[in-house]
């Protein structure tokens, strides 16, 4: 398993709107390259590569967003079934015609209540952004979508300092991945980027930089990223440490940054900066 990190690929970064309209191909490598281009700088995107069968092995790819899925359902009903049940068949392509391989997996292997097929990259992005898991199989021009939605709900606190009468009552908690999932649920776009980094020599605190690729000014994103990477400090115990260190004019009476406990407000600021 690997999380998609900041990496180079063979597809132009500014061509995502054109890429997302493409249908899925039978070549799993081509599909993966396009999805990695669309999800570049999305550190919560998980690409799980594996093979099924033995003679010959068939390449597969699971794709989901960490924090949006029920991990137990994913592990027990999808990954375990694919890695154990299918491996007992030496040659799945001979047992099922290649065109029916997806049907065989759909009907006999994956054990979830919600399961359907999709055929475009745009559908892949939309479903994983909603908490579903997508399975791509080499040689198949369609993908399977498994309903694995299962994010934090009632354990997420009501904001104490930003009380509202109307609208969502959810507030951020101390778990970073749960917090990014709260924003990801509201911004179901491949242009919403989450870049991960670690700050603090002793605390090794996980920090994420969130922005919408075609809305946030690139020079602003680059400057914030640069200032975060230049922070040299022993401990980061709360967000005030970060805010103080990246501000340009520390003595000004004018606000240079806002803090919020509400994911809907954070999402709104990303969409309408």
Q: Across the structure, where does each feature detected by a protein language model lie?
A:
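Membrane-embedded alpha-helical signal segments
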Residues: 1-273
């Amino acid at each position: 398993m690997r999380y998609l990190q900041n990496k180079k690929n063979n597809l132009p970064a500014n061509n995502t709107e054109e890429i997302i309209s493409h249908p899925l191909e039978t070549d799993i490598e081509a599909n993966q390259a396009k999805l990695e281009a669309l999800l570049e700088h999305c550190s919560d995107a998980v690409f799980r590569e594996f093979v099924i069968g033995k003679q010959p092995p068939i390449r597969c790819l699971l794709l989901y967003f960490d924090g949006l899925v029920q991990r137990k359902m994913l592990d027990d009903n999808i990954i375990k079934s694919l890695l154990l049940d299918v491996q007992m068949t030496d040659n799945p392509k001979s047992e099922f015609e290649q065109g029916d391989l997806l049907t065989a997996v759909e009907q006999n292997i994956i054990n979830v209540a919600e399961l359907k097929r999709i055929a475009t990259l745009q559908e892949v992005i939309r479903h994983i952004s909603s908490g579903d898991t997508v399975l791509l199989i080499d040689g198949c021009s369609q993908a399977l979508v498994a309903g694995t939605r299962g994010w934090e709900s009632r354990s997420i606190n009501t904001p104490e300092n930003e009380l509202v009468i109307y609208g969502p009552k959810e507030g951020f908690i101390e778990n970073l991945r749960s917090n990014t999932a709260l924003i990801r649920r509201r911004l179901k776009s491949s242009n919403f980027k989450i870049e991960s980094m670690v700050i603090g020599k002793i605390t090794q605190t996980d920090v994420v930089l969130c922005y919408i690729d075609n809305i946030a000014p690139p020079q602003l994103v680059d400057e914030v990223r640069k200032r975060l990477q230049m922070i040299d400090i022993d401990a980061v115990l709360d967000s005030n440490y970060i805010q103080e260190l990246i501000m340009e004019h520390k003595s000004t009476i004018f606000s240079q940054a806002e803090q919020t406990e509400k994911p809907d407000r954070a999402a709104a600021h990303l969409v309408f900066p």
